Every structure is written in C-alpha cells, then in structure tokens.
A protein has these predicted regions:
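Bacterial N-terminal signal peptides that target proteins for export
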Residues: 1-10
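Bacterial signal peptide processing site
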Residues: 22-25
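Tryptophan-paired
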Residues: 54-105, 109, 190-273
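Short, low-hydrophobicity acidic/polar segments
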Residues: 67-172
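A sequence/structural signal for flexible, mid-protein segments enriched
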Residues: 137-227
Length: 316
C-alpha cells in the first residue's frame, strides 16, 4: 500500500514538473511601440526645404494628463521603448526650433508654444509707435512647429513575441506664414534700415488642441526688401489671429533714413486677417522717404538721437 502511494506521488510530481517546464509566452508591463511620422509640407507661403532634424514624442496619461515617458526620434519616426500598459494621449513636435519655445511640457492640457521678446534696445527704436504702451509685448516671429496628436491610445500588457503596436501620426504646423506687399515706396535710396511690427496677434498656441491664445502680442520682423519698382515685400510668421482678440491689427512700418531720422507709418490691417486664405497683406499707398538734410544745404544736421521721429496714420 505504501509503495502504491509513493508511486502515485512520484507520478504527480513528475506531472507538475512537466507542466512547469512548458514554454509559455512571457508578458511584460512595459512594451515597445513603433511610431511612424509624416510631416505635412503643404504650407501656405512657406516652402519646407528640409525635414526637421529631431522630433520629440511624449506619452501622457490620458486620465490625468501627466507626463509618463518620451523619446526623441528622426522625422520619419522610430521605436519608443518601455511603455507601461495604460491609455495615453500622444503628442509629437519638432525639437529643432530657434525662436519657438515650449512651456509647461509635463502636462498634456497645458503645454504651449510661444516665442521670445525682442531686446529692449530694439523696442526703444520702436518707441515712436506712440499709440502703444510701455508694457507692450513685442516678440520675434515663431519658427514653424509641426505637431501631431493621438488621443485615447490604449497600450496593453502583451507577450514579448506579440506583434508590435504601431502608431501612425501626421504632424502639421501650428504657425502661419504671411506675405506683405506695399506699393509704393519712393526715396528708397534714402533708407538706412527698416523694420515692421504687426500688433494684436495670438501670443501662443496650446499645441495639444491647436488653440490660439486670446492673449495677444506684437510680432516684429525686419526682412523687408524694396525692388526697383519701389514695391516693398516681406514675410513673417505668426501663431495667427483669433476672433477672441478684439484689439485691431495695426502694421507699423519703421524706416530710419541715412541721417538717422525715424519715419513710422501706421496702417490698420485688421480686415486683412479675416477670411484671407492667401495670407497676403496688400497695402496700396505711396510712402515717401525724403532725402535728409545735409550740412551742404545750409541747415543744422543734428545727431541721430536728436531727430524727432515722424508718425503717419495711413487710411486705406
């Protein structure tokens, strides 16, 4: 009897060992994800000369909006490792901008893009745009920021030999490129330098929602060119305009002549930001920069900082 019991116990132990030694798929709470990226290059008034050099891919907890993990990928995408199993909101953007800054990056609901203020020395040169207050926020125009989003993406616990989870994400810019055309500038030979400011444009963009802020800034740019026909052209970038901004959009053209005198022309362009798919601001007026007085004219030539700057409001 005892031998029979022992024999049965031995068989039972061998059966347990056989079961324990069977190969089973391993599961893990962390799992790699393949992210495929596509950059939308069809942008009004802007030619994408090359792909971004680096993309940041952030996984946020979709319930709390809190940062969980991230990876830095080439513009075509790649693998993101060690993704804990849960539901995510995924946000991707290019990480190679010079003038566009990202803030509050640890929370999906608050992350936003903005740009930096111009130096006080530049702002002083624009002081004669007298209708603006000392606390006016004048910023550089932003670089294009390509943003992609996926919401409520569930990453399960899976066996290590299961097929990869693949996410396809398209990234589109949250920045607009606008053109400026002014006809006509006379006295171009008398211009030493020129710059421009457009007021009351969105100061930032909540990139998780592509939401323009109602807090506005003035955008500074200085890439104007005047051709032989006296046509001034320029390009500037902006986070755009929203109807939540009730202040007018005023273009200030700021010229400094070769003697150092400032000439400022203010033009209300509010109507041109509404229903304008071309994103071109056209100004059909003649602006004259007169030849500055010289000592040979028998007049007194003041120092640069003694000149009064000239303000002109142009009605179009």
């Amino acid at each position: 009897m005892k031998k029979s019991i022992a024999r049965h116990m031995a068989v039972l132990l061998l059966s347990i060992l056989a079961i324990a030694c069977q190969r089973r798929p391993l599961t893990t709470a962390d799992y790699a994800v393949i992210v495929n990226l596509e950059i939308e290059k069809d942008i009004v008034n802007y030619e994408v000369e090359k792909d971004p050099s680096l993309m940041r891919c952030i996984f946020y907890d979709s319930n709390t909006g809190a940062f969980v993990t991230q990876a830095f990928l080439p513009p075509t995408g790649g693998q993101v490792s060690l993704i804990p199993a849960r539901e995510y909101d995924v946000l991707v953007y290019n990480f190679d901008t010079e003038s566009t800054w990202l803030e509050d990056e640890n929370w999906y609901h608050t992350i936003y893009a903005s740009t930096s203020l111009i130096p006080d020395s530049f702002k002083t040169k624009l002081r004669s745009r007298a209708s603006k207050t000392d606390d006016e926020q004048i910023v550089y125009d932003p670089d294009h920021l390509y943003v992609g989003r996926l919401n409520d993406v569930f990453i399960p616990s899976r066996s290590v030999d299961a097929p990869a989870v693949v996410l396809d994400i398209k990234c589109e810019t949250v920045v607009e490129s606008w053109l400026l055309e002014v006809k006509t500038i006379t006295g171009a030979k008398n211009i030493g330098s020129m710059a421009a400011v457009v007021t009351s444009l969105a100061g930032s963009n909540k990139i998780a929602y592509d939401e323009r802020s109602a807090e506005y800034v003035s955008v500074y740019f200085d890439n104007q060119v005047i051709d032989q026909d006296g046509v001034l052209t320029a390009k500037f970038n902006t986070f755009g305009w929203t109807d939540r901004i009730t202040e007018p959009q005023v273009l200030s053209l700021v010229f400094t002549d070769v003697a150092g005198k400032g000439h400022v022309f203010n033009i209300d362009v509010s109507d041109q930001f509404i229903d304008n798919p071309e994103q071109i601001i056209r100004i059909n007026v003649e602006i004259d920069i007169p030849e500055p007085m010289t000592s040979g004219d028998g007049g007194f030539v003041p120092k640069v900082d003694e000149w009064d700057e000239i303000n002109t409001d142009i009605i179009i």
